């Protein structure tokens, strides 16, 4: 076996791609900071039980597992950073009131999300803890859209759903609640025949409401239809009101409501949102409310946030990250060294051509040269 081969769906990141990823990472983290989010850096490796406090069976399947040679306990390579940030908020920071946190780091998946997807993503995201009101969801939604616009994306479609609708329907019907997992599978897969079979012997109101969910999809006007087809329950009314406000405040995106989209239902407790663009089949960013995420760490707090994969974002972003640079000669010259140092201190990229290598690879656009004129080193256009 060749020593240079990598595992399936694992790849090196070469300079041009790495430069673009880093450019986007900096842009997004700077934007998060402008909203008041503080950076945290959780470890790549944790005890398995700490990583699997939420996310259900899917997260367990996606998590690499290994044995700690020091303790003998099972460790996991993180597949999602969100539970780690919840642990930090609940156990380490232990603040009262609102906490805004953001992060960027690698996550590993045992299985790729798609045929050509990588198993090593660079997850970046932001979370708000401590505020149960819709204001936090509105801020996170706007921050997610800001991040996508900073990456140069346009014609964004924002899909909105709400975990509270199905939760309210199951809470009012014990028989439906017993079939909750099967109903969730049928709704998630848009399997209408299975849904009809599962609801055939339920109460008329519950049956009609559950069967309506896959068809309650469209622009914001579908919320009016939902109010006529779903039971008048406080939880459902509140969920529809929340979605109406989220749709109205989604600046710079085309909004679609999908009350039958329950991906992440086991994880979320309120509004859910996903961002799509033309030509990309999967969501490029996902977010929503998950108030119970800190419960496993002994401190359940209201929480809402979003995340995306920087490698995928870099692949589809039109942002040009090819940097300009100054080409300088290499010489043992104090004045030259001082000029190069001053330019670098000012934020310029200065590439010194080593002896015998006067050509410079096209990774940087050397649009200027550092040349000696009348005993002084000056920058001139090339």
From Swiss-Prot:
Extract the GO molecular function terms from the UniProt entry: histidine-tRNA ligase activity
GO aspect biological process, one term: L-histidine biosynthetic process
Keywords in alphabetical order: Amino-acid biosynthesis, Cytoplasm, Histidine biosynthesis
| Keyword Amino-acid biosynthesis part of the UniProt annotation | yes
Read off the CDD domains from this record.
HisRS-like_core
Pathway annotation from the record: Amino-acid biosynthesis; L-histidine biosynthesis; L-histidine from 5-phospho-alpha-D-ribose 1-diphosphate: step 1/9
Q: Does the keyword Amino-acid biosynthesis apply?
A: yes
Q: Where in the cell is it found?
A: Cytoplasm
Q: What is the superkingdom listed in this entry's lineage? A: Bacteria
Provide GO CC annotations from the record. cytoplasm
Q: Report the principal subcellular site.
A: cytoplasm
Region forming the signal peptide: none
Q: What's this protein's function?
A: Required for the first step of histidine biosynthesis. May allow the feedback regulation of ATP phosphoribosyltransferase activity by histidine.
Fill in the misc note.
Answer: This function is generally fulfilled by the C-terminal part of HisG, which is missing in some bacteria such as this one.
**Subunit structure, per the record?**
Heteromultimer composed of HisG and HisZ subunits.
Family in the record:
Belongs to the class-II aminoacyl-tRNA synthetase family. HisZ subfamily.
Official protein name in the record: ATP phosphoribosyltransferase regulatory subunit
Q: Which organism is it from?
A: Burkholderia lata (strain ATCC 17760 / DSM 23089 / LMG 22485 / NCIMB 9086 / R18194 / 383)
Name of the gene: hisZ
